[in-house]
Amino acid sequence: MIIKEQIMIKKYILLMLLVLFAGNLNAQAKTYKMVFVPASEKGDESDYTSLIAITEKLTGLNIDTIKVTDYNAAVEAMRAGRAHLAWYGGKTYVKAAEIANAEAFAAGVRPGEKDAGYYTYFVVKKNSKLKKFNDVKGKVLSLNTIGSTSGDLIPQVELNKINLSIKNKEHFKKVYYAGSHDACLL
């Protein structure tokens, strides 16, 4: 059951920003490296196949992918010059802009929506007694990964609005980082 407090962040640091390393993308280079953190349990570039195909078509660039295991590694690949492009969430983009000279040039917009943004859901088991957002105090909480905008930062912001913090041991019985959005549901 999805608790009804569905959160939409519009025009905030945009959903999964596609960023361009502020280097020279000139005609001499044949292939550009795109770094990504797997978006699903499958964990391969098929998560980004459509994005890569569209980017290649619109820009004329050839793109190879570099898979990394976490957001910090994606930023570091850009900072070190091993990647030219990345698909980041808002929190990671801010870090990449600061230390890797990343520059946003596009944002993902879901089909049927006018603005870039994303949703964060708090999910409980079907027969759970948790019916309101405030009911989560003292329970076990599973988040995505440290550094995830939709799976870590925004849930913490929303919890703080009701005076709960994952850092306060009295607020949650246990807080887990599951490693992916899918794994949070297990």
Model region roles, listed by residue range:
Residues 12-21:
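Sec-dependent N-terminal signal peptides
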Residues 30, 34-56, 68, 91, ...:
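Bilobed "Venus flytrap"/periplasmic-binding protein-like clamshell domains
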Residues 50-91:
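N-terminal, post-signal-peptide region of Sec/Tat-exported proteins
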Residues 23-29:
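Sec/Tat signal peptide C-region and signal peptidase I cleavage site
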Residues 96-109:
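Ligand-binding "clamshell"
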Residues 2-12:
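Positively charged n-region of N-terminal signal peptides that target proteins for export
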